[in-house]
Structures are given as C-alpha cells and as structure tokens.
Amino acid sequence: MKKLFIQFYLLLFVCFLVMSLLVGLVYKFTAERAGKQSLDDLMNSSLYLMRSELREIPPHDWGKTLKEMDLNLSFDLRVEPLSKYHLDDISMHRLRGGEIVALDDQYTFLQRIPRSHYVLAVGPVPYLYYLHQMRLLDIALIAFIAISLAFPVFIWMRPHWQDMLKLEAAAQRFGDGHLNERIHFDEGSSFERLGVAFNQMADNINALIASKKQLIDGIAHELRTPLVRLRYRLEMSDNLSAAESQALNRDISQLEALIEELLTYARLDRPQNELHLSEPDLPLWLSTHLADIQAVTPDKTVRIKTLVQGHYAALDMRLMERVLDNLLNNALRYCHSTVETSLLLSGNRATLIVEDDGPGIAPENREHIFEPFVRLDPSRDRSTGGCGLGLAIVHSIALAMGGTVNCDTSELGGARFSFSWPLWHNIPQFTSA
C-alpha cells in the first residue's frame, strides 16, 4: 500500500502544483504589470511635484523641504544624492537612463531627477514588504495543501487497498492448492466484478481438474484391462517358444511400467496432491531400502556415503520411496559400478543425495532433464531402458513437498542428484480433487 499511496499522492500533488504555478504565473504577470504602471504614475507624479513645488528651492534643500511637506503617504518620499547608492554597473546605467530601479532588499524604488545628480527615493513601500511576506505564505500554504491532500487520498485508497489484499490472499491460497477458495467483496466495491471473474475462473479450473482426474482414471482402466488380457492369453498360449514368450512378457511389463509412470506423473502434475504424512525413522528406512537394492543388484555397489541421524519431521513416505527409487534406478542405469547415497540434515532443511560414477550430465542439459520424456544422447537414451518420466516425477514431488531437486557433478565422476525439502511440520496438505 505504501508504494501505491506514494505514487498516487505524488501524481495528484504534482498536478495540483503545476496548476497552481500556472495560475500563479498569470497572477504574477498581471500584478507586476499593474504594479509597474502604478509605480510609473507615482514616480511621474512625484517628479511633477518636485518641478512645481521645488522649482525655486536649491537642490541641496529639496530633502528638507519634502520632509516639511505633509503629503499623507504610507511611505517615505525623499531626495537623495546619487552618490549615496552603490549600485552595480547595469543598475547605474538604467538609473542614468531615466528608468526606475528597485532595491529589493530595502523595498525601495529609485529614479534619477533629470538634469541633476539627485535621485527620487520612494520607500520602504509596505506593498513590497507584503509581497515578500506573501511568498513565504505561499510556500507555507503549498506545504499545508500537500499535507491536506494526503488525508483524503489515504481515506479513499484504504478500502481499495484492503480489497486488493483480500484478492491477493485468495489468489495466493488458490495457487497453493486450496482450490475451494473463493472471494466475495461488499456490494458497491470497485473490485466486485473482479471478484466475480475470479470465482468463475476458480470454478472453471476446478471443473478442468475434475475432468482431468476422470480422464486419468478412465485411461488407467482402459489401458490396463487389455494388457491383463494379453498377459493371460500369452500364458495360455502353447505356440510360442520360451524366448518369444519371455520377450513378449518383457514388452508387456514395459508397457505396464510406462502406464504406471504416466498415471503417477499426471496425478502429481496438478496443484492438489493429497499428502499422507508420518514421522518415520528416515535413516533406518534408507539403510533398509539400500540393503534391499544391493541384494537384487549384486553386480553393482550401492552404499551409504553419509548418514546424519536426527528428526526429519513429517513426510509422505509413499512419495519419498518413489523419489529414492527413481533416483536409484536412474543412477544404476548409467553408473559403471558404484552408486552412493547420502542423507543430510542442516538447520531446517534435509537433503537426499544420490550420485554415480557414470558419464555424468553436461551443465547445459541439467535444467532439461527434469522435463518429461527428455533423453540425453548418446549415453542416456532409450536403449538403457526407462520411459523418460522418472526425474520429471521427482521434480513434481519436490514441488508438492515445497522442496527442490538439482543436478551437478559427483566426486565419483558421474551425476549427483540432490533432493532437498523443508523440515516444517506444516507441509501443505491438499485435499484431493
């Protein structure tokens, strides 16, 4: 609100200031023109008075004579020697030319008496002093108006700002996965129509997600059913050799794995994910899981590099198992002989690291490997197995848990994947669509 208030207030104040300056310039031009005319008339009248009243009096007695005259003026009118005033060259030239010269610091005007070394001095003039004071008053008035403008601007902006905060909070909650979030503004609010549009958008997104879920469930049923029938018929067939039967079973298993990965990715790639939280002994779970992996892959070395004991807060172990399996499968697929795993605990974050001694991943490709169906050539392609969704699923799980996943170079020479997540107990729990 502070930034918006300052922007709007400055715009309003600058517009007001420009208009005031324009009006002031017009007024100043008019006032100065009228004042100059009045001053000329005053000086001419004074000179005429001097010619008529002081004609027979010597110049050195003019000042004394003027003092004795009762002119009933609000300012002094006196005759003084020109040498009394130390003027700059420009002012002196103007004065000798018969022009009126103003002494701003003394609020006095001077005009040379023709054919003499005397000047007619008028002042101090109260009007000039008043004009000087008016300048100070103008500055004070502008400052007062500037302060006065801030109050109505704040009063006008406050309800709008509250509605904006309300809309921002609703949009933030909706973006965090609370898809039932709706917003309602008071009748007459400037944001009422925007609130209606937001609610319509939310309803449409909810309907789209529900339709997507229904489509995924339908695809799962329609694809799995013929695969089950195909596997059953394959088992019942006597016309295939053992090698052919084994090859077909392998192809069917790959199709089933691909379907399962696609469905898993589709379920994760949405703003709502139902997290089933528990507080397991994560170091024990990791040790047990790696022992099982080592048992089924005796030709590779799968070991723990670093294991930090501690409390790892609440986790969805179903998702954590998928993360570990996908990272280990990826490492085992491309390693030469060794895969190392670490579990670290630092402050309010935990990190699961899986690294291998394989060919590694070039820096320019590390941002793209978490996209679905991305394969890297020549060492990481379809010939090594997999469907190209494993790391994309890991990335989606990281987003669901409020964490991150990245890739860099391992000390073993291959790729090093780091899956990091916050240790907050308030990990967002979303309701399923």
Curated annotation (Swiss-Prot):
Residue intervals annotated with topology Cytoplasmic: 1-3, 157-433
NCBIfam families on file: PRK10604.1 (NF007898)
Transmembrane segments: 4-24, 136-156
Organism of origin: Escherichia coli (strain K12)
Modification after translation (UniProt): Autophosphorylated.
Histidine kinase domain mapped to chain residues: 218-425
All copies of domain HAMP, residue ranges: 158-210
Phosphohistidine PTM positions: H276
Descriptive protein name: Sensor protein RstB
Catalysed conversion reaction: ATP + protein L-histidine = ADP + protein N-phospho-L-histidine
Keyword Cell inner membrane in record: yes
